[in-house]
Regions:
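Extended, low-charge hydrophobic alpha-helical regions
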Residues: 373, 377-381, 400, 441-482, ...
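Conserved C-terminal guanine-recognition region of P-loop GTPase G domains, centered on the G4
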Residues: 177, 202-269, 577-578, 582
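Conserved G1/Walker A P-loop phosphate-binding module
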Residues: 111-190, 208
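Core alpha-helical transmembrane segments of integral membrane proteins
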Residues: 417-517
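Alpha-helical transmembrane helix bundles of large polytopic membrane transport and channel proteins
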Residues: 240, 250-402
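Juxtamembrane inter-helical linkers in multi-pass membrane proteins
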Residues: 452, 456-460, 513-541, 618-642, ...
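Transmembrane helix-loop junctions at the membrane interface of multipass transporters and ion channels
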Residues: 568, 572-595, 761-771, 792-803
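Hydrophobic core segments of alpha-helical transmembrane domains in multi-pass membrane transport
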Residues: 426-437, 499-504, 582-584, 598-612, ...
């Protein structure tokens, strides 16, 4: 076990030996020591700012008593009681609510390009005018990074208010600068490889070697954001800092001396507001300049030779740097960065340097000597070095309001949405309202209009083709195949767009993060953490991005479990199937029938989680450490653009995948093996293929070859189930559907549709995230579970006399 017992600065009171998990709500205290059996977890806690000497405020405990929420360094952090119990506190006192005395900082105009006071280290030769430039856009989670990327490139990437929206790198070209491209990297808190995002971001900068880094900082919380900035500076790449959300800082009465800040850091700092598109032009000018002239940060050293530790860490880092310089140059790793990572015990950097045993022993001796002289362990020493430097910089450059309007508003909202007795009811009301508006009010009304419009188009096309004297086979292909098949799917476009609109609003507002906080204890019983709740909630919209978003989960156990369970959450592509069959067979109870399917999916997911957690994924519970962002009003532009993107994707799918599937299905059901037009569909090619699978589904009550064929095409895209049934039956009226299903077997069919794999794209997402073997395992697991559950429902129905 790694443990520290450092004397914190600024002790107050006489309380000692108090653990963070027992701190009363509304009380402040100072961190005395941090312990953990997991070295990587402990480093992550330190990187988040929970270092010895840090003052913390207990904000609340989750409605079920765990996890807890604390405030430190200007932001909210959640962690579980088990982890909080390893953090010792001293100096417990009541929260200081009085006005904070800050030295005033006058308003100074930010210097234009070339007029700054920072001192970069420029290369001897500049890159030629018009040479290709590539930028890496890096920053903390939830700091406006993707919003800035959209402003720089004109793209419409999804912008949310939940940590970890960007789960993969996104590339784009800077507007009006065709020679300049930018990559939006996943949001991270440090360059320590705690999560997959941090590994992706770090390896991109080290391996791809972008011409410059654009580091975006949340100006409302500079102290926490600068922690990553210092590590990026150690990479010794040309760099510019985008100080985002400056409009919020000034609106709350705060100020930042930008000129002094960039002078102290040795890096150009440009104040911007990405949401309002302010300062973007100046940022681009500075970024192009530092990249073209290869201006690297003016300083790389943040530990003073005469610091509180007597210069022990300074001597340690410089000693290691001298020892490994040749190895670092050969491995193309910046020397200063490599030295600090060796102090941390970073295995990836250690392997890349190819150090021999004698060199490793020498480095360990240097680090051990530093720990003895500094009176603390290596991880705490590095974190304290960075935060001490940051504290000095912020003390000279930043005036913070005692409490921002955004935080005051968030605290008031959280009294209801995360309150002990109101959180769960509020969640149920919100989700119930979302589904009611989607399926019963707005979506249903718009769907009716869409159905009328498409029916009119099909009727007009049929009449026109008849009047033109078109061949009956060709007319059948156009009307019965393409128009009817694709049109039946397009009628569900309004419902899907409305659902995505509501999910976007919940995520953009910051509520998703609160749901993870509230639900963590529940999910822990199933072997998951609260962070897994968000990917599964996204899965109600689309399984593919939900699976991709599991990359934000720090634990491989958590990630694999979530990937395995997310497809059981009913995605929006299944809505057309539910809507058609529930509307046909349960016209008086369409919404309850559809909601019951969602509940079955959740229940099956919970049962599967319990089984997997006790078998294939047996192990200790994963940590839950997450930032809680302030609530923000959802951006109308962002919400509308997301809805438009989803509508565009759906329409594209309808006119590509579903169009092709419809044509293939029409062809197979129109011709026999000799390519003669069949009078009886049971003699068609499609009937022969469907009959191969039908016996497997017969015990479930729908052994009809048409049902099995629809399920097979549904693997391409779930909407294809509807287009296939439409083509095979010639219509989707209750009368037509009743020739194949009874109300009971229709419901069993829906249960199977709910639980078997959503689509080929979702399996492809599993393959890209976890590999081919795991993708095959997920596919087999879902098909097996779907068959078993459908069989149980069918058997129970027979026993109850429902069949």
């Amino acid at each position: 076990m790694v443990n520290i017992n450092a004397t914190p600065c600024g002790r107050r009171g006489r309380n000692t030996d108090v653990k963070l998990d027992t701190l009363e709500i509304g009380k402040d205290a100072v961190v005395a020591s941090v312990a953990s059996d997991d070295q990587a977890l402990r480093q992550h806690i330190l990187d988040m700012g929970l270092t010895p000497g840090t003052e913390v405020t207990m904000m609340k405990y989750a409605p079920m008593g765990d996890p807890l929420e604390i405030r430190l360094r200007g932001y909210e952090l959640t962690l579980r009681k088990d982890d909080a119990a390893r953090i010792e506190l001293v100096g417990i006192h009541d929260t200081d609510t009085g006005p904070r005395a800050n030295a005033a900082i006058g308003t100074t105009e930010h210097p234009a390009l070339g007029e700054g006071t920072y001192s970069p280290r420029a290369a001897k030769t500049a890159m030629p005018e018009g040479a290709p430039l590539h930028f890496a856009l890096a920053g903390n989670q939830n700091c406006g990074k993707t919003t800035l990327f959209n402003q720089l490139t004109g793209s419409n990437q999804h912008v949310g208010n939940f940590p970890g929206v960007t789960v993969d790198r996104k590339d784009g070209t800077i507007r009006n600068h065709p020679e300049a491209s930018v990559t939006d990297l996943p949001g991270i808190y440090s360059l320590s490889p705690y999560t997959g995002e941090e590994v992706v971001s770090r390896q991109f900068i080290l391996d791809e070697r972008p011409d410059a880094i654009i580091d975006i900082i949340d100006a409302t919380n500079i102290e926490r954001n600068l922690y990553l900035t210092l590590q990026l500076m150690e990479l010794d790449r040309p760099m510019v800092i985008a100080l985002n959300m400056m409009d919020e800082v000034t609106a709350n009465g705060g100020a930042v001396d930008v000129n002094l800040l960039e002078s102290l850091l040795g890096v150009p700092v440009v104040p911007i507001s990405a949401a309002r598109n302010e300062g973007i032009g100046e940022l681009v000018d500075h970024a192009l300049h530092v990249a073209r002239f290869r201006e690297r940060p003016g300083r790389l050293d943040f530990c003073a030779p005469d610091g509180p530790d007597g210069g022990a860490l300074h001597r340690c880092i410089h000693g290691i740097a001298n020892l490994i310089e040749d190895h670092a140059v050969t491995a193309h790793i910046p020397v200063r960065f490599a030295a600090t990572k060796l102090v941390e015990g970073d295995e990836l950097v250690t392997e890349a340097l190819h150090l021999d045993r004698n060199e490793l022993d020498a480095i360990e001796h240097i680090i051990t000597q530093m720990e003895g002289e500094a009176g603390t362990d290596r991880l705490s020493a590095l974190a304290d070095m960075r935060f001490s430097f940051i504290g000095d910089v912020c003390g000279r450059c930043v005036v913070k309001p005692h409490e921002s309007r955004e935080h005051v508003r968030s605290v008031k909202i959280d009294r209801i949405l995360t309150g002990r007795y109101t959180a769960i009811p509020a969640f149920l009301v919100i989700m119930g309202l979302v589904f009611w508006l989607t399926f019963g009010v707005i979506g249903a009304a718009l769907q009716g209009l869409m159905e009328d419009g498409i029916a009119a188009i099909i009727a007009s096309a049929d009449a026109g083709l008849k009047a033109f004297g078109t061949n009956d086979v060709v007319r059948s292909l156009a009307v019965d195949g393409v128009l009817t098949g694709v049109g039946s799917v397009l009628t569900f476009l309004p419902i899907i767009v409305v659902l995505f609109l509501f999910l976007s609003i919940l995520e953009d507002s910051g509520y998703m993060a609160r749901v993870a906080f509230v639900m963590d204890k529940v999910l822990r019983r199933f072997g998951l953490s609260g962070r897994s709740f968000v990917p599964m909630l996204v899965g109600f919209g689309c399984t593919v991005p939900a699976i991709m978003s599991t990359r934000t989960l720090p634990s491989e156990h958590d990630r694999k479990m979530t990937v395995m369970l997310t497809p059981f959450m009913s995605c929006s592509a299944k809505l057309p199937v539910y809507g058609l069959l529930c509307g046909a067979f349960f016209p008086q109870a369409t919404v309850p029938a559809m909601v019951s399917l969602y509940l079955i999916g959740i229940a099956v997911g919970c049962i599967a989680a319990l089984v997997l957690n006790r078998t294939a994924f047996k192990g200790d519970p994963v940590p839950f450490i997450m930032e809680l962002p302030n609530y923000r009003l959802p951006s109308v532009k962002t919400t509308v653009m997301l809805a438009w993107d989803k509508a565009k994707d759906f329409i594209t799918k309808a006119f590509t995948i579903i169009f092709a599937a419809t044509v293939v299905i029409w062809f197979l059901q129109t011709f026999d093996i000799r390519f003669n037009v069949v009078a009886d569909q049971s003699q068609s090619l499609l009937a022969g293929l469907g009959s191969i699978i039908a016996p497997v589904l017969a015990p479930l009550g729908f052994g009809d070859w048409r049902a099995s064929t629809a399920l097979v095409t549904g693997l391409i895209a779930k909407e294809s189930v509807i287009s296939t049934l439409t083509v095979l039956l010639g219509a989707t009226s209750p009368a037509a559907l009743s020739t194949m299903f009874s109300p009971f077997t229709a419901y069993v069919f829906l249960v199977f549709t709910l639980l078997y794999p959503p689509c080929v794209a979702s399996i492809g997402a599993v393959k890209s995230e976890l590999g081919a073997r795991y993708a095959v395992a997920v596919f087999a697991f879902q098909v097996t579970v779907a068959w078993i559950v459908a069989f149980v429902v069918h058997s129970a129905g027979i026993l109850l006399g429902l069949a």
